[in-house]
């Protein structure tokens, strides 16, 4: 089997590429073209010699279709993901997340791809109206990012219903782990502590999230890809454990072995009506359809992430907040 992974140079994408190669899968990695010929996090992988790199742009239909030649399965992860920046440049999110997904779906349809695994996000649910959140929970995106991901999800499901394209939609809750951008809360906390800061700058401490280690998430992709009964389905992937951002910061500080104070930084707080107050996953459907369940606990994932960040601090700027 040959697979195409879009967004392969990014956080989850690079872990998925690594995992697929470990399973003996032939992988073509779709990487956004850049003049430096950088392959992003794929440069760090010991298995990079086993990966076929394809440089292009998810917004360019021709390059997307060309990348699908000889491919059986497409894992579509390419997206603009930073929520704060979606307030600054929402059109960029429409072009990448909605139009880019259309390009993937239409190219897959014309190329007779056997399976398409499309990546959603728990952000499309908005603040939980009930918990744990299952796939029947109302969709209520509260940021431009979430709105574009919701639109992309609906496109994917429509291609299944209208054209018979064998699409599955994976909806990961808050994935974390090595290689994640400091725009995400866990690496933000860790790098500030590792930099020796005694006061850690954060936004809303009361919001709760379901934090799922990245290796759990990529194993979920694998399981969904293996099971044809997931075609046409939306499938949540989460740890089924809820923690507030304040408690998360304290847990990380304990694991690092440091005492911290938390300072509320107003620029890190979302607009009031845009804040997602609570997320907690119900992964029953994933277990029933594919047999997937998370193998790594929050604490195990945090320890691995802390260890990795200690060795890779050169990639991060702890004192600069970048949306």
Predicted features by range, described:
Residues 1-175, 296, 304-323:
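N-terminal Rossmann-like NAD(P)+-binding domain of SDR-like oxidoreductases, especially those catalyzing
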Residues 47-51, 163-166, 190-201, 227, ...:
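A short C-terminal helix-loop "cap" of Rossmann-like NAD(P)-dependent dehydrogenase/epimerase domains
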Residues 59, 88, 96-99, 143, ...:
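Residue-level signal for the nucleotide or nucleotide-sugar donor/cofactor binding architecture
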Residues 74, 217, 221, 237, ...:
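Non-catalytic, hydrophobic alpha-helical segments
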Residues 150, 175-188, 195-200, 214-215, ...:
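Glycine/proline-rich active-site loop of Rossmann-fold NAD(P)-dependent oxidoreductases
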Residues 151, 155, 159, 189, ...:
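Hydrophobic alpha-helix immediately C-terminal to the catalytic Tyr-X-X-X-Lys motif of short-chain
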Residues 204, 233-235, 246-249, 257-278, ...:
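C-terminal "lid/loop" region of Rossmann-like NAD(P)-dependent oxidoreductases
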Residues 214, 234, 269-293, 304:
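Conserved C-terminal active-site "lid" loop/helix of NAD(P)H-dependent oxidoreductases
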